[in-house]
Amino acid sequence: NVADPLLYMVALGFGIGAFVPEVGGMKYIAFLGTGMVCQSAMFTSSFEAMYSAFSRMHMQRTWEAIVNAPIALDDVVVAEWVWAASKAVISTAAILLVLMALGYGRTPLALWVLPVGFLVGLTFGAFGLVMNALAPGYDFFTYFFTLVLTPMLLLSGVFFPVEQMPAALQAAAGLLPLKHAIDLARPLMRGQLPTSIPLHVAVLL
């Protein structure tokens, strides 16, 4: 879950970055890297809440063993949710460290990207657990990745500014949680406070 975004960041950041030096007042690799931080949190928490939680629930029967103790099923679900968000923070921290090692995001405000990663993890961990509850098998999760996560990855401003898209797509992007996460993270990486923080947090929650 960490290797893929790092590969994208290095390959596209240095490759396209040679032709597009700056985007939105940032080096392209820093612009892309911030998007990769948020999309990594999205994919990590989604994968954990779907594939890993499904395995623990159905294949390993871990949930069944836990609820035999004096623990409610609600507690197990909340624990899975928080664990998915925690893994999102781990992936966020890993990519953030790489960016800082490359000389980007060396500002105290960049540390606030970690709570943003946790919020992203809570959002997509919840989506993942809903899909988990509906899934008859692993193949079912492909629909969520193909129909929800991939379009969100492409339309939320990970690779290029949302402002470059047609007005209708810009309006649609404004409804996407990943776009609001990126709108929080990018200013922080530049050492600036984001605007419309309550709106972005409200969409994520």
Go through each PLM region and give its residues.
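Hydrophobic alpha-helical transmembrane segments of multi-pass membrane transport proteins
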Residues: 7-12, 29-101, 128, 146-148, ...
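Hydrophobic alpha-helical interface/terminus motif in multipass membrane transporters
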Residues: 3, 15-16, 20, 53, ...
